[in-house]
Swiss-Prot record:
Changing E225Q: Induces endosomal clustering. It comes from Homo sapiens. It catalyses: Na(+)(in) + H(+)(out) = Na(+)(out) + H(+)(in). The modification Phosphoserine is found at S571, S573. The modification Phosphothreonine is found at T510. This is Sodium/hydrogen exchanger 8. GO terms for molecular function: potassium:proton antiporter activity; sodium:proton antiporter activity. The keyword Phosphoprotein applies. It is found in: Golgi apparatus membrane; Golgi apparatus, trans-Golgi network membrane; Endosome, Multivesicular body membrane; Apical cell membrane. It is a multi-pass membrane protein. Na(+)/H(+) antiporter. Mediates the electoneutral exchange of intracellular H(+) ions for extracellular Na(+) in 1:1 stoichiometry. Acts as an Na(+)/H(+) exchanger in the trans-Golgi. Contributes to the regulation of pH regulation of Golgi apparatus, and consequently, in protein trafficking and endosomal morphology. In germ cells, plays a crucial role in acrosome biogenesis and sperm development, probably by playing a role in the fusion of the Golgi-derived vesicles that form the acrosomal cap. Can also be active at the cell surface of specialized cells. The gene is SLC9A8. One of its GO terms (cellular component) is apical plasma membrane.
Length: 581
């Protein structure tokens, strides 16, 4: 009846005007009484030509991104193929992005095409799609033994060191602005910039230490600090943005500091607790629900639990990055050992592949941004920021290293301190955070974005590119070791990751073997002893002999199937078979 009335209202009969006017008026009143007021649509629906244009634009954006990734993969392959190990992949990919940006600019200048929208980097895409796999993989591939044994030192570098660097850079920018040396920024904006620019890129850092063959504990200190540093930097930046959104005009500096500290502690520990809890729940679920005979379901459950803490944390105003980092560490330490061998390998390789694609995409678009980003370049601001970034890194590394040496058996030498300071490269996270800042006016936002791009490119291209000369300059070993190091140095992350499967992730210990190997050891202390005695047995499944037999059969079947396919391939030959064997 309501639909009929609406039809009468929309299409009045023009032949019987008098009757229909009365009927129309009555029906309009009735319609208004019966039909509810329509609410706003949940999502804006675009139809017709506008929807078609948006679909075409999205398709071109996807095509352009995939094309950039494909070219970058070929570039990385050429680096590995021709053994250009002295050149970090991030440097090569950023350089390629700059070259592609220049070509696109020439094409646009000649009016042959317009790819402005496709080459622009969207910060929301970075934080929702690209950053979570990078952070989760870094936590998942962590060597937990050394990490938990050095958790105190790692936390000191990651939390206090990053905070020191943020305060040095932010405070320096604020006071230089007040002295009219550079453009003025208020205190919260200065601290936000200092926080985002304090995030270091761990890839080149770890390549340096692997090349120097340093102590694995020291390697873990730097790697753990680099991983936690990203999450801490993001939380500090969110803290500064939260203070910006509040009215802080009537609040003293001490009260502002206390509010910032309270916000940071809630974000840090709340997000870490949420990620840890999610990881422990995933371990219990996959311990008591045996999905090992259906690897596709098992792998699907792992992917769900991997992204789950990020969405939940962001939904309740916590840090999704911090949550997904701790979830990755916990899932790797407990959940991973409840998986079948096939899913263990599949999970490692999938995470590495996705993280590589995400990192490559960000570095490529970083190079493209030189020509696509609306810049506001101020030479004095850029120079002072570079000086403050280097000084803030020094104030972070040297005092904390000397402090740690009082409590450590493995001392951090001055040579190592210098290399740690030199290897504080900035990468994808500062760039994306700078685009995500909500600063007014627009000129201030462009100034921060341009300065961040310059600092990132300066550290990646200049510091990253001079990594190999520095290693050779500071290599003071004997001649044989010096010659060996020249051959062994390899800054290709992809080649190293592709050549190995983490052995600690493929543990096949029965209940008796686990007890003999871990629980009866007398040298375990603190959290390591607690974990081996109570936590690990509670959250992980101890394998029976039948489980081990089934896992080995599964792996053998898959290996034989793959080998048969290789032998039957069109390019198979006896020489190839001998090489495989």
């Amino acid at each position: 009846m309501g639909e009929k009335m609406a039809e009468e209202e929309r299409f009045p009969n023009t032949t019987h005007e008098g009757f229909n006017v009365t009927l129309h008026t009555t029906l309009v009143v009735t319609t208004k009484l019966v039909l509810p007021t329509p609410g706003k649509p949940i999502l804006p629906v675009q139809t017709g030509e506008q929807a078609q244009q948006e679909e075409q634009s999205s398709g071109m954006t996807i095509f352009f991104s995939l094309l950039v990734l494909a070219i970058c993969i070929i570039l990385v392959h050429l680096l590995i193929r021709y053994r250009l190990h002295f050149l970090p992949e991030s440097v090569a990919v950023v350089s390629l992005g700059i070259l592609m940006g220049a070509v696109i600019k020439i094409i646009e200048f000649k009016k042959l095409a317009n790819w402005k929208e496709e080459e622009m980097f969207r910060p929301n895409m970075f934080f929702l799609l690209l950053l979570p796999p990078i952070i989760f993989e870094s936590g998942y591939s962590l060597h937990k033994g050394n990490f938990f044994q050095n958790i105190g030192s790692i936390t000191l570098f990651a939390v206090f060191g990053t905070a020191i660097s943020a305060f040095v850079v932010g405070g320096g920018i604020y006071f230089l602005g007040q002295a009219d040396v550079i453009s003025k920024l208020n205190m919260t904006d200065s601290f936000a910039f200092g926080s985002l620019i304090s995030a270091v890129d761990p890839v080149a850092t770890i390549a340096i230490f692997n090349a120097l063959h340093v102590d694995p504990v020291l390697n873990m200190l730097v790697f753990g600090e680099s991983i936690l540093n990203d999450a801490v930097s993001i939380v500090l930046t969110n803290t500064a943005e939260g203070l910006t959104r509040k009215n802080m005009s009537d609040v003293s500096g001490w009260q502002t500091f206390l509010q910032a500290l309270d916000y940071f502690l809630k974000m840090f520990f709340g997000s870490a607790a949420l990620g840890t809890l999610t990881g422990l729940i995933s371990a219990l679920v996959l311990k008591h629900i045996d999905l090992r005979k259906t690897p596709s379901l098992e792998f699907g459950m792992m992917i769900i639990f991997a992204y789950l803490p990020y969405g939940l944390a962001e939904g309740i105003s916590l840090s999704g990055i911090m949550a997904i980092l701790f979830s990755g560490i916990v899932m790797s330490h407990y959940t991973h050992h409840n998986l079948s061998p096939v899913t263990q390998i599949l999970m490692q390789q999938t995470l590495r592949t996705v993280a590589f694609l995400c990192e490559t995409c960000v570095f490529a678009f970083l190079g493209l941004s030189i020509f696509s980003f609306p810049h506001k370049f101020e030479i004095s601001f850029v120079i002072w920021c570079i000086v403050l970034v280097l000084f803030g890194r020094a104030v972070n590394i040297f005092p904390l290293s000397y402090l740690l040496n009082f409590f450590r058996d493995h001392k951090i030498t001055p040579k190592m301190m210098f290399i740690m300071w030199f290897s504080g490269l900035r990468g994808a996270i500062p760039y994306a955070l700078s685009l995500h800042l909500d600063l007014e006016p627009m000129e201030k936002r462009q100034l921060i974005g341009t300065t961040t791009i310059v600092i990132v490119l300066f550290t990646i291209l200049l510091l990253g590119g001079s990594t190999m000369p520095l290693i050779r300059l500071m290599d003071i070993e004997d001649a044989k070791a010096h010659r060996r190091n020249k051959k062994d140095v390899n800054l290709s992350k992809t080649e190293k990751m592709g050549n190995t499967v983490e052995s600690e992730h493929l543990s096949e210990l029965t209940e008796e073997e686990y007890e003999a190997h871990y629980i009866r050891r007398q040298d375990l202390k603190g959290f390591v002893w607690l974990d081996a005695k109570y936590l690990n047995p509670f959250f992980t499944r101890r394998l029976t002999q039948e489980d081990l037999h089934h896992g080995r059969i599964q792996m053998k079947t898959l290996t034989n199937k793959w080998y048969e396919e290789v032998r039957q391939g069109p390019s198979g030959s006896e020489d190839d078979e001998q090489e495989l064997l």
